Amino acid sequence: MANPITLTSLNIADHVKPGIWTKNPDAGVIAKLAPQVQFLAGTTDIYTFTETPKAELVGEGNNKGSSDYTPSTVTAKMLKFHLTYRFSDELKWADEDYRLGVLQNLADNIMVGSSRALDLAGIHGINPATGTVSNLIPDYIMKSRSGVADLDAAAAALQANGYTATGIAFDPVYAGELARTKESATSNVPLFPELGFGFGFDSFRGLRAGASNTISGSEEITRTTGALIPQAIMANWKAFQWGIIRNIPLELIETGDPDGQGDLKRKNQVAIRAEVALAFAIMDKDAFAVVTKTAA
């Protein structure tokens, strides 16, 4: 008989973390566009300077005036997410190659879920498991947000707010619509050839770009008629800072009821759980312009 599965020394970050946050097409897009920084556990207040600094010209022998500007603060709160999967306890008896294959697939899935969680919390403020806004998330991009009609209007809004765009996050359906847009009604020449068919693109009109349905939240959020649905977010993504506070370990659970689905021993099951603690902070909401449509 094969030895029972042992996960105490396995850490996802040591094996599959590099690249999966930014390259997996099913994952989120914020981690591709926004800088990752270090956050500590708990709640962190960050000083922000959103006004343009204005230096004073001082004549020889003249007194210097005060730079009359008080910084504001934003709060980054640690958020914990978990994924828990159940398997038949026969998994413990499988050969090593099979067990490692299961763990690799599970690790990939967990990292995708964690990446999507960052987007769904940071853009919509929702608990990904329920699709509803969570009071654990103090601020998010769509909070009290009005949208703009198209990308030109998004660029104009950023410019009016004194920001330069660094990237665009697309909903895949909207990206596909743009990819199929032609130069004219009688032309077959794509207006945006860099989008190809709307899959796997990394840039758009000179800006870094990515696509995920986390932008609209179409898989998680049920919207009422008239609600705003994000189609694209053009932003100076330096204003969205995020970080992983704790690596993502796998835990094998063989007893108890870890997810409310019944006793593991009674059901001849084991559970594998991964948790991630992360934080993010939005430095200035004016650094984001959101193209939206209205739910029918």
Model-derived features: positions:
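Protruding loop/beta-arch "assembly-hinge" segments enriched in small, turn-prone residues
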Residues: 1-28, 36, 252, 258-296
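Short amphipathic
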Residues: 81-86, 274
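Structured loops at beta-to-helix junctions and adjacent beta-edge loops in soluble globular domains
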Residues: 49-50, 88, 171-173, 212, ...
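Extended oligomerization regions of viral-like shell subunits
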Residues: 148-263
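Assembly/oligomerization interface modules of large self-assembling protein complexes
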Residues: 2-83, 287
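Cell-envelope/extracellular anchoring and linker segments
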Residues: 55, 80, 120, 124, ...
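Short helix/loop capping segments that flank catalytic or ligand/cofactor-binding pockets
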Residues: 55-57, 95-96, 177-180, 242, ...
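Alpha-helical scaffold segments that mediate packing/assembly in large oligomeric complexes
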Residues: 86-164, 290-296
